[in-house]
């Protein structure tokens, strides 16, 4: 689409993912064995024919920038368009950090102006879904809208986590509440917007002048423009997941191991592209038992794996058992280990006779809001020495060496 530019907001820290985002931005977190979260939004763009893309980064962007590079895996290494990493920078008027989602777009007006598009699509870089943005744009045009917000129904119990909208019979948005304590509906914004560029450009310029604004699309821009302009809700009935918590991240990964998963990463008509290492095929020894699991390239499995997701280059030693767990790339698990209900981040080394996820559940002594399930999380580049036992709902930070037992709920 020659008259469309996509801007992907990828600067989020993802604090609710705890140690998983201590070293990297949330969109760079691995998902589904071989992907990173941003791959799904980038793939949606190119599958929809959008090849002019800006990725707005901020928090710990190094790994994310390295992953995207010049965009070759997504066919974005091109002279006309392609992908551009847009990091915050100093100007004569502004400091270096983006001060909200709307401010991030405002500070990159010149990038969009260079393409002189009719439409701009604003997207989040950390959600799991497949969407043909052509359908969204066609709907936007049919409604003669100045802005369109993709939305879906959510359970009332979850509505306060979202931007919630009230619409009329034509799906025109007449009220918008950002994460309300008492939601008036269950129609939730997915953080996916289409705007007429000439319109939103002026709105952003005016918003930047307002010292009382938080410069956020959900809190400021959408509530303001619905008062006078044609802003519509686009109902989306496909799979969409915000994997913003430890539990939702773990659950969404394990959903992929079902015989018929709710989200299809194997769809030949809507491929998910990624930048991954060239590795040999996985090796599964004759003594191994593997059931309902995703096993990525370069894995060597000598133990038993069930209902788990293994990223590239994972090694599991003889006699070890891995159940209901997400194991990220280049993790080394020794012999005779037992691991259940765990998320183990990249480059972790686990010795022999280690037990993880055992015992009775206990509340987290680190952060009850972030760590509130039976899932134990091991941060990147840590070492768990042989014969260590770690309970349920435990946390091991990044770059740690663990040589003592942790009871359920404890952290190091």
Swiss-Prot record:
Any Pfam family: NTP_transferase
EC number: 2.7.7.27
SUPFAM superfamilies, A to Z: Nucleotide-diphospho-sugar transferases, Trimeric LpxA-like enzymes
Keywords: ATP-binding, Carbohydrate metabolism, Glycogen biosynthesis, Glycogen metabolism, Nucleotide-binding, Nucleotidyltransferase, Transferase
Recorded metabolic or biological pathway in which this protein acts: Glycan biosynthesis; glycogen biosynthesis
PROSITE patterns, alphabetized: ADP_GLC_PYROPHOSPH_1, ADP_GLC_PYROPHOSPH_2
Single Gene Ontology BP annotation: glycogen biosynthetic process
Enzyme class, first EC level, given as a word: transferase
Domain of life: Bacteria
Reactions catalysed according to its record: alpha-D-glucose 1-phosphate + ATP + H(+) = ADP-alpha-D-glucose + diphosphate
Residues that coordinate or bind alpha-D-glucose 1-phosphate: 98, 163, 178-179, 189
GO MF annotations, alphabetized: ATP binding; glucose-1-phosphate adenylyltransferase activity
InterPro entries: ADP-Glc_PPase, ADP_Glu_pyroP_CS, GlgC_bac, GlmU/GlgC-like_hexapep, NTP_transferase_dom, Nucleotide-diphossugar_trans, Trimer_LpxA-like_sf
Assembly: Homotetramer.
Family: Belongs to the bacterial/plant glucose-1-phosphate adenylyltransferase family.
Its biological purpose: Involved in the biosynthesis of ADP-glucose, a building block required for the elongation reactions to produce glycogen. Catalyzes the reaction between ATP and alpha-D-glucose 1-phosphate (G1P) to produce pyrophosphate and ADP-Glc.
Entry protein name: Glucose-1-phosphate adenylyltransferase
Gene designation per UniProt: glgC
């Amino acid at each position: 689409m020659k008259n469309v530019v996509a801007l992907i907001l990828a600067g989020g820290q993802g604090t609710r993912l705890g140690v998983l985002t201590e070293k990297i931005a949330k969109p760079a977190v691995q998902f589904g064995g071989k992907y990173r979260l941003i791959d799904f939004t980038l793939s949606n763009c190119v599958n929809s024919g959008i090849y002019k893309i800006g990725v707005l980064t901020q928090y710990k962007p190094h790994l994310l920038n390295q992953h995207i590079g010049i965009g070759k895996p997504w066919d974005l290494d091109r002279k006309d368009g392609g992908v551009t990493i847009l990091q915050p920078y100093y100007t004569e008027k502004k400091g270096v950090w983006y001060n909200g989602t709307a401010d991030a777009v405002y500070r990159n007006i010149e990038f969009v102006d260079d393409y002189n598009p009719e439409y701009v699509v604003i997207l989040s870089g950390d959600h799991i879904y497949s969407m043909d943005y052509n359908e969204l744009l066609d709907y936007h045009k049919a409604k003669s809208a100045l802005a369109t917000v993709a939305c879906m129904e959510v359970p009332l119990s979850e509505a306060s986590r979202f931007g919630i909208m009230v619409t009329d019979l034509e799906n025109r948005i007449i009220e918008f509440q950002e994460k309300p304590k008492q939601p008036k509906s269950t129609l939730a914004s997915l953080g996916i917007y289409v705007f007429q560029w000439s319109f939103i450009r002026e709105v952003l310029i005016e918003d930047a002048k307002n010292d009382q604004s938080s410069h956020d699309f959900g809190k400021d821009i959408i509530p303001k423009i619905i008062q006078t302009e044609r802003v519509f809700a686009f109902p989306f009935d496909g799979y969409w997941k915000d994997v913003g918590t430890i539990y939702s991240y773990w659950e969404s990964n394990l959903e992929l191991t079902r015989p018929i998963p709710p989200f299809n990463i194997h769809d030949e008509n809507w491929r998910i592209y990624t930048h991954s290492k060239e590795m040999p095929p996985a090796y599964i020894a004759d003594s191994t038992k593997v059931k309902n699991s995703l096993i990525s390239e370069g894995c060597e499995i000598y133990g038993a794996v069930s209902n788990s997701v293994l990223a590239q280059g994972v090694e599991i030693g003889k006699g070890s058992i891995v159940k209901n767990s997400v194991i990220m790339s280049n993790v080394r698990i020794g012999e005779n280990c037992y691991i259940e209900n765990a998320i183990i981040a990249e480059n972790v080394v686990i010795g022999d006779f280690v037990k993880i996820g055992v015992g009775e559940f206990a509340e987290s002594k680190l952060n009850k809001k972030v760590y509130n399930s039976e899932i134990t999380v091991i941060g990147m580049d840590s070492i768990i020495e042989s014969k260590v036992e770690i309970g349920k709902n435990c946390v091991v930070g990044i770059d740690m060496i663990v040589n003592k037992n942790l009871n359920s709920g404890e952290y190091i």
